[in-house]
Amino acid sequence: MFANRVRQAQKLYQKRFFSLGNNSTISKQQFKNSSNNNNNKNGGNKNGFYQKAFIATTVALTTTLLTATTLLDDNTNSEKEILKSQRQTFEKYASTTLEGERQMTAEDFLSALTTLESDKQSGEHEILKASLDADKFKVLFQMADVDHTGYISFDEYVMFDELMAKPEAEYFLAFKLFDRDGNGYISKNDFKHVITASLDPSIPFNFDCELVNLYFGDGRTELNYSQFTQLLKDLQQERIKQEFKFHDKYNSGYIPRDKFAKVLGSVKLRKIPDHVRDKLESISELNLLSGHPNEVSYSQFVAANDMLLHIPSYGRVLKAAILKNKKDNINKEEFLTEARSSTSIEITPLEIDLIFHLFDLNKDGKLSISDFEKSTGLNINKIGGGTNYSDSYPSDSHVTIQNSSTTPSPSTPITNTAAAIALNKKHGKTFAQQVLESIENFALGSIAGGIGAAAVYPIDLVKTRMQNQRAVDPAKRLYVNSWDCFKKVVKFEGVRGLYKGILPQMVGVAPEKAIKLTVNDLLRDLFGDKSKGEIYFPLEVLAGGFAGMSQVCVTNPLEIVKIRLQVQSTGPKVSAITIIKELGLAGLYKGAGACLLRDIPFSAIYFPTYAKMKTILANEDGKLGPMDLLLAGAVAGIPAASLVTPADVIKTRLQVKANAGEQTYTGIRDCFQKILKEEGPRALFKGALARVFRSSPQFGVTLVSYELLQKALLPDAEYKPPTNAPITQKDFDVIRGNTNTVQRVIDMESKFGTLHQTRDNNKSSNGGENKN
């Protein structure tokens, strides 16, 4: 129902005004039908080879579909909450009933528009009402009253609210205000009329400038919506350029420093922290030797304008440069070098001079994070990618928050990335401290690995026995399937039989998981882009592959002992010590090649998938709960475990001692060829399902335990999860909830120049108050 309203709104506004874009959506029912159709196609051949061979892949796809369905349900719940809020607001202010349906009058609509989140803000409520003059309200009401009845129905209110929630709402409002005759185009006369009424008449705007002539030609060209939005962007630069010329009375290329600060402060395409705004006039100090101590040159004016547009980007550059140079502060050359290597922003030496002049508080020629944060009010740890940095400023700081992008977008929470975590590391740690930290992480990884292995060990035993079953004749097979194997082990060997060989497993899994997690972390940190908190995907896979390779030298000897203990069912039992003596040092590494073929691809698939799942499951604050981590680990284990099953089967066959009359193998190739010849390709996927059901929860439990143990046992230690993928989860509620329509109008006026100086002009005409 809600989605239908949105689509109706889009169609209505497309027809009435202009195209708002096409949103392609797939309903949940279509999604389910598609899934069912696929299942029906595959269901007719349940006993076929391909289904059995790739059964784990099917499980992985099913899990992916279930995850997608869950995400769709989450979005649906969010939409229901929004609709509920819209209904509550409408019912609160709608005072008229027509034909049995509640309706809003113009006064009701005005009250609804100017309502803030808190009813306690009644003073601001009245200010918003006062700021919405008759002309602007008329435009808004006409936009909402689609059927021209003079009243607003609930459906119309929802449509209007949906439109105002769009990121381009401010452009849309500006377009409607400029389009005086409502024909969907902006003429040069429309443009001149609004701009003339909006700007300060004491600084006339030259409508015969090159910019206006390029857009409107000889005056007969009219602009559609898209063309108009580009004009609004370019208009800002033209305004300040003309204002500079106006204040340059003697054509000297300099203007008074107070006029310089006023002109730059009048443009609302950026955020200007109060500390920076107050220091803009001090830029004139750089001209003491040139004979213009109280003036600012045009080159400085242009450089300062560019600099103010990119303050958050400079914060990222500073952070990356300090990490790269391993120093607490950097000089101009180091800053410029990092800026050119890590950003697409072209920074000039003059801009560098201005940056250090404004932000270098102690004037030592070096810039530190502390200097930057004190000068700007920015929290440098919260600076992420993109152009909207509202959350980078502390809530109690006195910072003028202005849109930093020419395309308006709702503020989104920006969470810490791996680079931000790395930035929090204390510089100058002693070697002993670093060693202690590594030991702590290793110990936690060992304990977590043991917990994960013990939780799923019975499944591992069943998997090993199924893979080792070599008889081709069904009559000679000891186990029909994994479930039959499980039942027979419990029946003939007892519950304790399910845990045969667990001691070597516990001894081996601790260093295995600890080494794997530690190496993966180390390589991700080495390969990653610290300035952005990101890692190139092929390098991410490479890090996982090396992590898997690093564990084999330690775990292969213990695993071969474990496997030989697991396959002992009846008859005389052989101890682990006896097995070790029998094999010798060389024998303990039997099957190591197959082990590498299994573990390297497994880790190369698992760790990037786990990192990606963490980003998907993170909440609006970028945080994950224990169940989120468990699910991320479990889902990542599905493709990783299933796709490397053939290597695991070969490894098991090579490491198990063949009984009398059973086939023996001389190596990986020999084993592979004999299995294909004697048992068929399906034998390469024996135990695939058990492996999936073992590996997925095992690694999920391991990683959850790792992170929870670190929080519980080392709460004051630096938090370092097994994978440090950056989390950038957008919050749907924030996108919808922090938007007030009247505030949109005010922001639009400030941004695009419409009615920008009107309030000051009114004050001047009403008694000359606040002439400054």
Curated annotation (Swiss-Prot):
EF-hand domain: residues covered: 132-165, 166-201, 235-270, 347-382
GO MF term list: calcium ion binding; identical protein binding; L-aspartate transmembrane transporter activity; L-glutamate transmembrane transporter activity
Region (N-terminal domain): 1-377
Residues annotated for Ca(2+) 3 binding in this entry: D360, N362, D364, K366, D371
Compartments where located: Mitochondrion inner membrane
Residue numbers binding Ca(2+) 1: D145, D147, T149, Y151, E156
Membrane-topology annotation of the record: Multi-pass membrane protein
Keyword Repeat part of the UniProt annotation: yes
Main location: mitochondrion
CDD domains, sorted: EFh
Quaternary organization: Homodimer (via N-terminus).
Biological function: Mitochondrial and calcium-binding carrier that catalyzes the calcium-dependent exchange of cytoplasmic glutamate with mitochondrial aspartate across the mitochondrial inner membrane.
Comment field on protein domains: Upon calcium binding, the EF-hand-containing regulatory N-terminal domain binds to the C-terminal domain, opening a vestibule which allows the substrates to be translocated through the carrier domain. In the absence of calcium, the linker loop domain may close the vestibule, which may prevent substrates from entering the carrier domain.
Name under which the protein is recorded: Calcium-binding mitochondrial carrier protein
Organism: Dictyostelium discoideum (Social amoeba)
